[in-house]
Amino acid sequence: PASLTGISAHMFENCEKLVPVTVPEGLLEIGDSAFAGCKKLENCPLPPNLTRVGSYAFDKCTLWNAELLPDTLTEIGEYAFRQCKKLTEVTIGEKLLNVGEGAFYDCDGIKKVDWQAKVTRIPDRVFQSCYYIETVKLPETVTEIGEYSFYSCGYLTDIGTFERMKRIGACAFSNCDELVNIGTLDAIEEIGGGAFISDQKLVLSLDGLQHLRIIGGYAFGGCPKVTGLRDLPALEEIGASALDSANIPEVANLPRLRRIGASGLSNRSLVTVGDLPSLEYIGDSAFRNATSLTTFGAAPKVTYIGANAFEECRKLETLGLDGVAAEIGREAFIACTSLKSLDLSNVTSIGEKAFSYCGTLETVVSLESITSLGKNAFEECRSLVTVGKIGNLTRLPNEVFRECKALANVTLPDTMETIGTAAFKHCYGLPEIVIPDSVTTIEEEAFSGCTSLKEIIVPDSVVKMGNHVFGGCRSATRIVFPKYLT
């Protein structure tokens, strides 16, 4: 009837055979899910005085093709037009200040969006999976783009300039295959996780963004044309895999950076990392396979270096981590074949194979604070000559110095009780070793192949020795074993 001002919630929901509907011009509101699931609804022109379209109101009305949203609209509820496949253009009028999450979700016929309402936030998922959108015009008032707002808009190339933009939500522009330009981001503070993941054509420099605090995990994963990580005075966090494919030869002037997530800068283009005075956390694989990296500046506050953090950084010569009170994860520096000297005096924990295959490493200044040392920690550091004081360990791990062929100077602590299997195997250059009176067990092959050992004195405290402990020690001229060894 002409006097009708509202259509109640769910009134025609799932009326699958419903075809064109004519509504009176005086209609002010279409309730939640009013026509949801009316899959054959072909036409439903919105009246000129309409103020509200409820949540899911036209959900899955696949053939619904009324393009014009009246200027009187002030609210569109969440998922109101989801999967309305025949929509080709959307204009958000100046009065339409309340648009719900996913309002046009998967409307893959839309090609053009003109958002005139002066909103500050673009809702989550509002145009998610609108694959064929080519043009988007957003108001200059926007300061935040919600999560997944333009996710998988595969034909989108340009979204204009956002001089006031402070936050881009997670996956906001993820899988936008043709996106090239996102304009000015001078006010940006946070770029959410996966915000631009797989946007291979995106051209963007991050240099000089004065307010940027957070780059979320995978934010620019798979974005080879993203460049620059210099002069970012507010940056505090780089998330996991955030810049793994970007073109970033230098990291410099990041005075507040505290955290680099897993694989955050695992980047083959990276050559130099400047001083990071606030850095505390280096995540697993953070610089893994950064095969061009030569210099890592001073980072005196680091407390954690994750597993594989610098794995295969074969050109890394300068490492500004001397004296840090850190925990070092397994394989953290494995195969860093250009490192020559390390001061680990304040390190408390070193994981398995942390420095294995560091072939040019000559000196470890000290291990005096160590409370946990993993097996194979320095295996095949073939140039290692000197290991400073080792902390109060009770067990020297298996193969910890195996194949350290140049090792000539190492001092075991008087807390040592067990020398592990093959701990010094094939340390050909080791001329002497003092086994503390605290040692009770020497496991098999512990000193096997130490061909330079001249004197072997096993203290009376040792009650158990494995097979071939001193096998191949052919230079030994004096050997003393305990009287009661079993």
Question: In which residue ranges do the predicted regions lie?
Answer:
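Consensus positions within tandem repeat domains that build extended binding/scaffold surfaces
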Residues: 8-13, 31-34, 54-57, 77-80, ...
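Structural signature of tandem-repeat unit edges
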Residues: 1-6, 16-29, 39-52, 62-75, ...
